[in-house]
């Protein structure tokens, strides 16, 4: 009979009987292709779930409300995603040595993730973005050197010009990057010193999606000054606040995200002040 009949979605069974499923799983991973090219995954929530997640098997608590959002970001932007992650629940399930739930697609592309402290995670992410900007500025200067010279073929110049005009368009830069890499290889073969330098900058051709992720402890309390500074900078970064309304990772203590009247550790008689309106504060910029 079916051992799952009448049970809930997850049922505990002896491991020995499940080992045969490993072969089935490996077959599916190796042979079943992604279907995300059949729909526009960014048009609505339903379509987004056809995109392959690049965040899997995190080991977070069952029923965790944070991981679906982290997974969704990887489905939409994972192949070009950079993550600056505050310490907290999200740093535990995202980077517990020796494994990580972040993975790569069939082209070897996936999120680049790093963990920082509670108090500087936003500045850390802003630093990533500023470094990325500087490297891309260098690419523009080198491309302009090639465009001003007489050695490159006209078709190659058109591709470089198209990149400069569309360098902030993710889809366009994805399309142009392989063509530019081929042009750089041709330049190296022809002894072009500019092409040699560009070879080390090819990872910056595709527009990156910079994410800053932290919980309410980091975002509302300990790292709020940095969060405010980064929002005020106007830089092209995305901030995900995993607001559980308590300090989840340390056991449920009250934070400035905890609503008025709520009972939590350090607020046993009910929180005395209202929840800090972080969204409203962000709109002041």
Where do the protein language model's features map onto the residues?
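N-terminal leader/propeptide and maturation segments of large enzyme subunits in energy/redox metabolism
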Residues: 117-193, 197
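Non-heme iron-sulfur electron-transfer modules
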Residues: 2-47, 109, 155
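Beta-sheet entry/capping signal
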Residues: 7-10, 79-84, 89-92, 209-211, ...
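Mobile "lid/hinge" segments at catalytic clefts and subdomain interfaces of large enzymes
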Residues: 95-133, 241-246, 253-254
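Conserved thiamine diphosphate
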Residues: 47-60, 115-130, 134-149, 206, ...
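Thiamine diphosphate
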Residues: 32-33, 93-94, 103, 190-192, ...
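Extended, highly charged accessory segments
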Residues: 70-71, 76-87, 95-100
């Amino acid at each position: 009979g079916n051992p799952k009949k009448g049970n809930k979605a997850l049922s505990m069974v002896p491991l020995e009987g499940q080992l045969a499923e490993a072969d089935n799983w490996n077959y599916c991973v190796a042979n079943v292709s992604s279907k995300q090219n059949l729909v526009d995954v960014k048009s609505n929530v339903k379509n987004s779930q056809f995109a392959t997640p690049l965040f899997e098997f995190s080991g977070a608590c069952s029923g965790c409300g944070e991981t679906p959002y982290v997974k969704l970001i990887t489905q939409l932007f994972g192949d070009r995603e950079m993550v600056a992650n505050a310490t907290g629940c999200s740093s535990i399930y995202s980077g517990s040595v020796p494994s990580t739930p972040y993975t790569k697609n069939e082209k070897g592309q996936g999120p680049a993730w790093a963990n920082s402290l509670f108090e500087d995670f936003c500045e850390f992410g802003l630093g990533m973005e500023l470094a990325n900007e500087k490297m891309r500025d260098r690419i523009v200067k080198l491309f302009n050197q090639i465009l001003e010279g007489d050695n490159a073929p006209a078709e190659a110049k058109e591709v470089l010009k198209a990149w400069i005009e569309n360098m902030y368009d993710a889809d366009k830069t994805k399309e142009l990057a392989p063509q530019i890499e081929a042009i750089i290889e041709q330049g190296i073969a022809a002894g072009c010193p500019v092409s040699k330098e560009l070879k080390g900058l090819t990872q910056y051709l595709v527009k990156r999606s910079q994410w800053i992720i932290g919980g309410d402890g980091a975002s509302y309390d300990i790292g709020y000054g940095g969060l405010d500074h980064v929002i005020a900078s106007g830089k092209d970064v995305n901030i995900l606040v995993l607001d559980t309304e308590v300090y989840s990772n340390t056991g449920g203590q009250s934070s400035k995200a905890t609503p008025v009247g709520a009972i939590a550790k350090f607020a046993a008689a009910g929180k005395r002040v209202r929840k800090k309106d972080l969204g409203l504060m962000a709109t002041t910029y």
